[in-house]
Curated annotation (Swiss-Prot):
Part of the 50S ribosomal subunit; part of the 5S rRNA/L5/L18/L25 subcomplex. Contacts the 5S rRNA. Binds to the 5S rRNA independently of L5 and L18. GO terms for cellular component: cytosolic large ribosomal subunit. Belongs to the bacterial ribosomal protein bL25 family. CTC subfamily. Keywords: Ribonucleoprotein, Ribosomal protein, RNA-binding, rRNA-binding. It holds the Pfam family Ribosomal_L25p. This is Large ribosomal subunit protein bL25. One of its GO terms (molecular function) is 5S rRNA binding. GO terms for biological process: translation. Residues 1-22 are annotated as: Disordered.
């Protein structure tokens, strides 16, 4: 079963003044929505900075709170708004889950190996870095791996090459390309025809007319 991380949240009052006070005390305004009635809470800034990374992108959090409506809810961190200059978190959206109902999430695709096409002069073009899947919250994959070792020039890896199991259902189209090895185009500078050909001789000047 997917591990859950305990995260403490506390009830909060709404309004700009209250939100500003929370941020001053190094807490972040947040809202819980989804499988529950929307609930306003606050969460420690330090915790959000820690968990707002790719490593915890689809992590399940078990909320701990003095507010009975929030305590025990299992959530995903759906989004974090950050200040454009200080990069401090300003607001958090928590998505509450029903553990018995499937949810759609994006899962990172990690490429493994070195494509043989690179030694043939090809260039690797990564088209998709994540795919969308639907599954039970407890079966959300941490990431997918895709081996590109056998890709020669002109070969491609598609979504259909990713293997899924359990309740996981691929939503991204099977025909979509994840990575492809393209041939490296050679630039040939063609010399202008005028420069390649000898200049045409100028016509001879007419002799002056004889004086009578």
């Amino acid at each position: 079963m997917k591990t859950r991380i305990d995260l403490t949240v506390e009830p909060r009052e709404t309004g700009k003044h209250n939100s500003r006070g929370l941020r001053t005390s190094r807490n972040v305004p947040a809202v819980i929505y989804g499988a529950v009635t929307p609930t306003n809470v606050s969460v420690g800034e330090k915790e959000i900075v820690k968990y707002n990374t790719r490593a915890y992108e689809n992590a399940l959090f078990n909320l701990k709170s003095s507010d009975k409506t929030a305590n025990g809810i299992v959530v995903l961190i759906k989004s974090v708004d950050v200040h454009p200059l200080t990069r401090r978190p300003q607001h958090v959206d928590f998505f509450a889950l029903d553990l018995k109902k499937a949810v759609r999430v994006n899962v990172e695709v990690r490429l493994e190996g070195k494509a043989i096409g690179l030694s043939e002069g090809g260039l690797l073009n990564v088209v998709l870095r994540s795919v969308e899947v639907e599954c039970l919250p407890t079966e959300i994959p941490e990431f997918f791996t895709a081996d590109i070792s056998n890709l020669a020039v002109g070969d491609a890896l598609h979504v259909s090459d990713i293997k899924v199991s359990g309740s996981v259902k691929m939503i991204t189209g099977a025909e979509q390309t994840i990575a492809v090895v393209n041939a490296q185009e050679e630039e040939v500078a063609a010399a202008p025809a005028a420069a390649a050909a000898p200049a045409a001789a100028a016509p001879a000047a007419k002799a002056p007319a004889a004086k009578k």
